[in-house]
A protein has these predicted regions:
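Short hinge/loop at the helix->beta-strand junction immediately C-terminal to the helix-turn-helix recognition helix
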Residues: 60-61, 136
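Short, charge-rich, low-complexity alpha-helical interaction segments
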Residues: 63-71
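Acidic/histidine-enriched, beta-strand-rich ligand/metal-binding domains
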Residues: 94-95, 116
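Short amphipathic alpha-helical boundary/capping segments
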Residues: 8-15, 83-91
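Long, low-complexity, charge-rich intrinsically disordered regions
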Residues: 1-18, 22-29, 37, 44, ...
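A short acidic, leucine-rich amphipathic alpha-helix
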Residues: 37-41, 112-116
Length: 184
């Protein structure tokens, strides 16, 4: 096959297989992470990681998806495109917090959203716009107010619950507990 990543030399084969297995297992349990996140978590040199990611993509064990400035990695065939879009946003701290806030406070106006964050209103506005463009949240006009809510609450909540360990965020743990109490 032309363009395939060359086979590793005999002496490094065991090391390569072990690294590849670690990378694949990490992506399976933490879908949607980007290159640098994977590199930091697994402590594998960047060049080595890129080599193995290309290899796993070419073998169609994982898929790579462009997300703005990032390439995110997912296990092949296990996550649909809608869920990839959700995970892409949930892997970013501010959009994740906005989504969790809106799941617990549907139909909130921008002021209510912004006052619950330490980031500037312009930063929150940027991320709200990003979530609107990705169609994960919607806005509706009620009188003079614009109200925001999550389009598919069940899917977003399911992704948060399913992959909560991959976010390393105590707010996600709190959210999962609260959501589970409200939606038994």
């Amino acid at each position: 096959m032309q363009g395939m990543t060359p086979k590793p030399k005999k002496g490094s084969e065991a090391f390569d297989i072990e690294n590849r297995k670690r990378i694949f297992e990490y992506i399976k349990s933490h879908p949607g992470k980007h290159l640098r996140e994977i590199q930091r978590k697994l402590d594998i040199p960047l060049g080595t990681l890129e080599y193995h990611l290309r290899y796993l993509v070419e073998l169609e064990l994982i898929v790579e998806k462009e997300d703005g400035h990032y390439r995110r990695y997912y296990p092949q065939g296990t996550i649909g495109s809608k869920d990839k879009k959700i995970l892409s946003m949930l892997n970013q701290p501010i959009p994740r917090k906005i989504l969790m806030f809106l799941l617990l406070h549907p139909n909130a106006n921008f002021k209510e959203i912004a006052k619950n964050f330490s980031e500037s209103p312009s930063t929150i506005s940027f991320h709200v716009d990003k979530l609107l463009k990705s169609e994960l949240i919607k806005k509706e006009k009620l009188g003079r107010e614009m109200l925001y809510s999550v389009v598919d609450e069940q899917s977003v909540a399911k992704m948060l619950i399913t992959y909560k360990q991959s976010f390393l965020d105590s707010l996600v743990e709190s959210f999962v507990e609260t959501w589970s109490e409200l939606h038994p």
